[in-house]
């Protein structure tokens, strides 16, 4: 009895720590005004662009999870097209998949966006058709569950698996990214650089060059990224080097670019 009491107290204290830390982390990130500053304006950069974003979701879910979406811009195009899953759309339509031309680095219900992936130039141009095909092939357009999935993060992870050249590494706060049907418990990780075993996103393990070693328990992710010297914790997210150094790639922090250049995660703007 004493053992179970101590275990229960430990779990309670850990959950309190997670909630408090996630509140602080969310406030700290939202204090950085990133909306409108992460995507190159079509008038200033004519090359192809692929970007993946995350932002804290709305309501109580924001304590633990982010919402993710993917945006693309074809070479010489004047507009970005964003793709995402929005669950409440199913109340009025037969699909939760949303496709629209808009500002890709918008805020999400007041929460500032975080750039997870940035690919520009010839590589982006070659991958955009594959991304669009993956969007069209997403099997859960009419099926949505906030937890454990399929949800918006399941959608983004699906694109990562279908287009492994993206090298997409979703954060530990992207609850639903590990959702897999019983018929496909084992398969490629979301980054396309490793393998994953997961049962409906409730329990699983992943190992890959981008993810590092990742353990999932009830949708909460613990990740050790040895290559980038970072760790990721449930609700809190990444501690360590960011996946994308926005000071190096975004026109809001760096010189505007007007010509089609090769990219590094994949983007390097000079």
Per-segment meaning from a language model:
Residues 8, 19-20, 261, 266:
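Intrinsically disordered, low-complexity segments
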Residues 14-25:
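Bacterial N-terminal signal peptides
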Residues 30-38, 43-118, 141, 221-236:
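Glycine-rich catalytic cores of cysteine/serine-nucleophile enzymes that process amide/ester linkages
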Residues 54-56, 76, 84-89, 113, ...:
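A mature extracytoplasmic/lumenal domain signature
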Residues 103-164:
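Mid-length scaffold segments of soluble, non-membrane domains
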Residues 1-10:
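N-terminal secretory signal peptides that target proteins for export/translocation
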Residues 28-35, 137-270:
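Activation targets extended, charge/polar-rich intrinsically disordered C-terminal tails
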């Amino acid at each position: 009895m004493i053992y179970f009491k101590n275990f229960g107290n430990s779990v309670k204290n850990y959950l309190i720590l997670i909630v408090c830390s996630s509140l602080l982390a969310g406030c700290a990130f939202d204090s950085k005004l990133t909306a409108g500053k992460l995507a190159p304006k079509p008038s200033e950069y004519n090359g192809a662009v692929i970007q993946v974003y995350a932002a804290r979701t709305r309501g109580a879910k924001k304590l633990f999870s982010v919402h993710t979406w993917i945006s693309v811009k074809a070479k010489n195009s004047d507009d970005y097209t964003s793709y995402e899953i929005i669950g409440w759309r199913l109340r009025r339509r037969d699909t939760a998949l949303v496709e629209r031309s808009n500002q890709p680095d918008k805020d999400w219900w007041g929460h500032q966006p975080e750039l997870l992936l940035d690919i520009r130039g010839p590589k982006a141009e070659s991958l955009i058709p594959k991304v669009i095909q993956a969007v069209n092939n997403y099997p859960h357009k009419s099926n949505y569950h906030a937890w454990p999935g399929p949800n918006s993060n399941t959608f983004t992870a699906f694109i990562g698996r279908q287009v492994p050249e993206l090298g997409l590494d979703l954060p530990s706060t992207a609850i639903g990214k590990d959702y897999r049907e019983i018929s496909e418990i084992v398969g490629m990780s979301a980054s396309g650089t490793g393998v994953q075993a997961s049962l409906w996103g409730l329990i699983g393990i992943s190992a890959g060059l981008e993810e590092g070693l990742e353990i999932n328990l009830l949708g909460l992710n613990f990740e050790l990224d040895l290559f980038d010297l970072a760790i990721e914790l449930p609700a809190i997210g990444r501690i360590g080097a960011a996946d994308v150094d926005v000071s190096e790639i975004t026109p809001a922090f760096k010189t505007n670019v007007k010509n089609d250049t090769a990219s590094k995660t994949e983007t390097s703007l000079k």
